[in-house]
Amino acid sequence: MNILYLENHAVFARQVTRQFLSAHQVTVVPSLSAARSALASGSFDLVLSDFDVDDGKGDEFVRECRAREPRLPIIAVSSHDDGNAALVAAGASAVCGKMQFDRIQQVIAGLNRERV
């Protein structure tokens, strides 16, 4: 699975990718501008989006993803409930909080079942 992961904390993103997403091809981007560029130039099966990033809020990117690819699965991965709620309100398909990444494969599998 080709995953676009919007996360501005590089050490955390590396750890999550290594520990929980190693079976996937993951493109980690630290900002909205980098996420927009990656989405425009690549094809992704899934987006993971944090809420607070250096150049804005992830809900803006989620709305853009929804407008561009309405069926693209998007998982909200903020460490704050309010951030996850904003991401879901913007169109995220599911939530997997930062401290719950041990559940990420279950969340991905659930989204894949819903798409079939």
Predicted regions, residues:
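Acidic, metal-coordinating helix/loop segments flanking the phosphotransfer/catalytic sites
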Residues: 28-46
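Conserved phosphotransfer microenvironments
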Residues: 45-65, 81
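C-terminal output helix
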Residues: 99-112
